[in-house]
Regions:
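Flavin (primarily FAD) binding-site architecture
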Residues: 274-290
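N-terminal glycine-rich phosphate/pyrophosphate-binding loop and immediately adjacent elements
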Residues: 3-134
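Conserved acidic residues
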Residues: 4, 258, 270
Length: 290
C-alpha cells in the first residue's frame, strides 16, 4: 500500500510538491485553509469583476515549461501566454514614465535616449546576466539542496568571480550606468528577492536577463490560470485537494509526523510537507519540541 503524505497549503509550492509526490507513487492529500486554492496567488471575484490577489507578472517561462514537462505536459495544454509589449511601465513621477519595450533593439534605443553610449554597456551587462542565469539555474536553483556537498564543484568554484558573488548589485550597475532612471530600472528586480541592491550579490543580475531577454508574459484570463492548471494536473495525478481545512496541529511520535489535525477532521500521514508560510507553521502549528 502506498504511503500517505499530507501537504499543507495549496499555493504554488504545495501544489508542485503534491504533483511530484503523486507521480512518485505516494497517496497525497493537500489541505488548504481557504475556500479556493492558490495561496497568495488566489483569485477574488466581486460584482462581475475578477482580481488576481498576488503575482501580476509571469517571468522565467522556461521554469514553468520545465515543471509541466516533468509530467509529460506543456503549459499550452492548460493556458495560453501573451508576451507583453511594452513589458511594463515605470512611473518615476507624475510626468516621468518609462515604457520598457519587449523588442531588444528598441530597448537599446531607449537606453541611448536616457544615456548616450549606454546601449553598448547594456549588451555587455546582459551577456554577463545570461551566463549567470544559465549557471545559476542549472548549478544552483535546480539542485535539490540536500547537502552543501552538491555545491563543492571545482567548476563552480572557478566561476565564483565571473558570477560576481562578491560584488553587490548596486556596485555592478553603477560601474556601467550613470543615469538615475536606468539604474533604478536595472536594480528593481532584486526587490523580488526581498533584499536591497546594496546587499544583493551581482550574480542576481540574472533577474535582468529574465526580465529583458526572456520577457514579461501574461496568461490569458489572468495569473490564476496557472493555479487552475496546477490543480488540474494534481487531480489528474490522483491528488486529493481538501479546501476549508485549516491545520491546527501536527501529531508526531519518535520524531516522525503521524497525523494532521484541522478544525474538524484528522488525517493520518506517514509524512507531512509544509507548503504554508514557514513562520505560521513554526509559530502556530508546531510545538517547541517538534
Amino acid at each position: 500500500m502506498s504511503k500517505k503524505v499530507v501537504v499543507i497549503g495549496a499555493g504554488f509550492a504545495g501544489l508542485a510538491a503534491a504533483c511530484c509526490l503523486a507521480k512518485a507513487g505516494y497517496q497525497v492529500t493537500v489541505l488548504e485553509k481557504n475556500g479556493v486554492p492558490g495561496g497568495r496567488a488566489r483569485q477574488y471575484s466581486a460584482d462581475g469583476f475578477v482580481f488576481d490577489m498576488g503575482p501580476s507578472w509571469y517571468w522565467m517561462p522556461d521554469v514553468f515549461e520545465q515543471f509541466f514537462a516533468h509530467f509529460g505536459k506543456k503549459t499550452s495544454d492548460y493556458y495560453q501566454l501573451q508576451r507583453l509589449d511594452p513589458s511594463y511601465s515605470i512611473f518615476f513621477g507624475e510626468d516621468e514614465v518609462m515604457h520598457v519595450p519587449a523588442n531588444m533593439e528598441e530597448l537599446f534605443a531607449m537606453f541611448e535616449r536616457y544615456e548616450p553610449g549606454s546601449s553598448r554597456n547594456l549588451k555587455k551587462f546582459l551577456e554577463e546576466a545570461k551566463y549567470k542565469y544559465e549557471v545559476g539555474m542549472a548549478d544552483f536553483v535546480n539542485k535539490p539542496s540536500h547537502s552543501m556537498l552538491e555545491f563543492v564543484d571545482l567548476r563552480l568554484i572557478k566561476s565564483m568571480f565571473r558570477l560576481q558573488m562578491f560584488t553587490s548589485m548596486s556596485t555592478h550597475v553603477r560601474q556601467l550606468f550613470n543615469n538615475r532612471q536606468l539604474i533604478e530600472l536595472l536594480e528593481f528586480p532584486v526587490l523580488f528577492l526581498g533584499a536591497t541592491p546594496a546587499k544583493t550579490p551581482a550574480m542576481y543580475s540574472l533577474m535582468n536577463y529574465a526580465d529583458m531577454a526572456l520577457g514579461t508574459w501574461y496568461p490569458e484570463g489572468g495569473m490564476y490560470k496557472i493555479v487552475e492548471a496546477m490543480v488540474s494536473l494534481a487531480r489528474e495525478l490522483g491528488v486529493d485537494l481538501q479546501l476549508n481545512q485549516e491545520v491546527k496541529q501536527i501529531l508526531s511520535a519518535n520524531g516522525l509526523a503521524t497525523k494532521v489535525i484541522t478544525q474538524d477532521r484528522e488525517y493520518t500521514a506517514d509524512a507531512v510537507v509544509g507548503g504554508a508560510d514557514y513562520h505560521h507553521l513554526d509559530q502556530q502549528v508546531l510545538t517547541p519540541e517538534q
